[in-house]
């Protein structure tokens, strides 16, 4: 059988900014989860429209439900002290979340669970509720009002929001256990994506997603993961030359910008 010409075509790399609008399709989230299973010792169970991935210790489960797309969270990560115990913490992914956020979350979860499972499941060794983030004040503004705190992008399209469990603010999504919420909702598009974390989620998991979202640099992505057309008018895309044509001695003028020196913001509880 002849080779598929699409398989022989080299994939391009592109820079997308701002990175919080570099949306990805839920089907790509499932593809990423498939790759995750292939590269780890986690087990997978496939249903008619679902993919459930379970850690070797059976205490962490990741469920992707294609039928939930557009109606609520289509990927849910949950932790229990054992298979029969009540849920200890939960992370929910809805909409066109940038695949880099999903990859960072899965990679951090798997790596930390392999080295320090009690930290992931029980929070042992972590300072509860403490998260230190570094942001570019030219790209994000800090706020602390009406029982909520966090950061909002200067264009108003995205936010990272903290709601303590004892806050007077209304519960996020009607769930008082949700303490962190990251979302993008451009005015011309409406709800684009969101990720929420409940109270006992290990801070390092939130940090992996928040740091990716707040990073002011463009995101580097392969065209293997296409950008949904709905956000095309809202982002800037720069196509990079193939690796064989890129200079090796010095970076090109149009290459990825250097990471700016991080600027410290107050610790947020």
What is the predicted function of each stretch?
Residues 1-269:
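Compositionally biased accessory segments in Actinobacterial proteins
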């Amino acid at each position: 059988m002849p080779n598929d010409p699409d398989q022989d075509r080299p994939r391009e790399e592109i820079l997308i900014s701002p990175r919080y609008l570099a949306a990805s399709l839920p089907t790509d989230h499932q593809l990423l989860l498939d790759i995750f299973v292939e590269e780890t010792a986690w087990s997978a169970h496939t249903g008619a429209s679902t993919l459930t991935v379970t850690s070797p210790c059976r205490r962490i489960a990741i469920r992707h439900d294609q039928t939930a797309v557009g109606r609520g969270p289509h990927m849910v990560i949950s932790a229990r002290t054992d298979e029969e115990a009540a849920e200890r913490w939960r992370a929910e992914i809805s909409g066109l979340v940038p695949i880099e956020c999903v990859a960072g979350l899965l990679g951090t979860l798997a790596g930390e669970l392999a080295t320090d499972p009690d930290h992931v499941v029980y929070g042992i060794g972590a300072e509860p509720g403490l998260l230190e983030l570094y942001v570019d004040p030219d790209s994000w503004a800090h706020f602390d009002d009406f029982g909520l705190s966090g950061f909002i992008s200067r264009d108003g399209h995205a936010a990272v929001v903290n709601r303590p469990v004892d806050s007077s603010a209304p519960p996020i999504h009607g769930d008082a256990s949700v303490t962190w919420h990251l979302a993008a909702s451009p005015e011309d598009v409406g709800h684009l994506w969101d990720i929420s974390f409940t109270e006992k989620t290990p801070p390092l998991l939130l940090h992996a997603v928040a740091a990716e979202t707040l990073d002011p640099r463009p995101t580097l992505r392969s065209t293997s993961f296409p950008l949904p057309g709905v956000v095309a008018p809202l982002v800037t895309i720069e196509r990079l030359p193939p690796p064989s044509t890129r200079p090796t001695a010095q970076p090109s003028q149009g290459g990825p910008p250097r990471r700016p020196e991080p600027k410290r913001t107050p610790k947020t509880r």
